Amino acid sequence: MAQQTIESNNKKSVNRGKDIAKDTILTPNFYTTDFEAMEKMDLSINEDELEAICEEFRKDYNRHHFVRNKEFEGAADKIDAETRELFVDFLEGSCTSEFSGFLLYKELSKRIKDKNPLLAECFAHMARDEARHAGFLNKSMNDFGLQLDLGFLTANKDYTYFAPRAIFYATYISEKIGYWRYIAIYRHLEKNPSGKIFPLFNFFENWCQDENRHGDFFDALMKAQPRTVKSLSQKIEIFGYTLKHPIFDYYHRFRYFLNNHPIVSKLWSRFFLLAVFATMYIRDLGTKRNFYGALGLNAREYDQFVINKTNETSAKVFPVVLNVYDKSFYKRLDRIVENGTRLSEIDKKENPNVIKVLSKLPIFISNGYQLIRLYLLKPLESDDFQPSIR
């Protein structure tokens, strides 16, 4: 993510824009979706719950929560150089992620407000929360002599298109996993105050409730759309032409049936859960491990707790969840983390690029094999996993 150059406290110019702008599979992305399909969504199946959640958003419980106090004064100067770098990296990623959510929710609220006002209002309230979070994180970065240029970011970041159903799945998991991440850190630091390296963590208890409410919204939204958005299967683009001729009617019916079959929902549930869990685990046990160590957390134990809790929570809305209790689940993720270390070691060697690529190929194949085995692991039926809740 790009960020503005700001003079640090020691008057040394700092510019990390190029580093942040560099995208990888593990960095937060910016998203767009099918706004026409979203505005046509029929919420009548679960409108009462969505209206109740919107009323919760209107109350804005955290309106006066994100107010900096005297604890922030000079707090950045007390952090050693190594921990400082780790924490700034955490702030950058978190701010980018929150701002990404703001842009998506804000654009949705603007595009669908005329035809789907209830949905638009919910997205507007969530955009408010995400903007507040991003701004608060950006102020903490300013304590370290840095600041993200959010305007530049909006104009220059590439946007990834996801169909509405993919947005529902991925964002629900993202919001719920955010809740468990923040509350786990907050509870740990309550018991171990020596690991509280910056006063930002004092705000995590109320902060995580925003994430939880956002997740509840997507839960209710998916209940209002038990299969998928109808317009997903009504057209397909080939060489710039839309197949709307009656001759393609049976083709569209088949695509609609395929997209809406319960088995497909189960496959998508497994895919998005695994994608989010694997990405977090690989990142946290790879490049972020030392940051959690600075907080006094064991990164592996922390991630496994968060994954288990998010998986359990997801059983409230997804038809199946991952069997994270199978002994092979975390072993395979650990193998991918180990492979990541091997890839980094290859990059450090002064060998020709061809040699590096050939050396990495077996590792990439190994990673793909582990992910396929994880995906094919027999899932847990949510009705059996949490019958009392469902």
UniProtKB/Swiss-Prot annotation:
Keywords from the named record: Chlorophyll biosynthesis, Iron, Metal-binding, NADP, Oxidoreductase, Photosynthesis
Please write the reaction equations for the catalytic activity of this protein. Mg-protoporphyrin IX 13-monomethyl ester + 3 NADPH + 3 O2 + 2 H(+) = 3,8-divinyl protochlorophyllide a + 3 NADP(+) + 5 H2O
Gene3D superfamilies, sorted:
1.20.1260.10
Q: What is its EC number?
A: 1.14.13.81
Q: Does the keyword Oxidoreductase apply?
A: yes
Example GO biological process term?
light-independent chlorophyll biosynthetic process
The cofactor required is: Fe cation
| Pathway where this protein functions | Porphyrin-containing compound metabolism; chlorophyll biosynthesis (light-independent)
| Signal peptide range | none
Q: Does the keyword Electron transport apply?
A: no
One GO molecular-function entry: iron ion binding
Per the similarity annotation, which family is this?
Answer: Belongs to the AcsF family.
NCBIfam families reported in the protein's UniProt record:
AcsF, PRK13654.1
Role, per record: Catalyzes the formation of the isocyclic ring in chlorophyll biosynthesis. Mediates the cyclase reaction, which results in the formation of divinylprotochlorophyllide (Pchlide) characteristic of all chlorophylls from magnesium-protoporphyrin IX 13-monomethyl ester (MgPMME).
Please identify the protein, giving its name as recorded.
Magnesium-protoporphyrin IX monomethyl ester [oxidative] cyclase
Origin species, per record, is Prochlorococcus marinus subsp. pastoris (strain CCMP1986 / NIES-2087 / MED4)
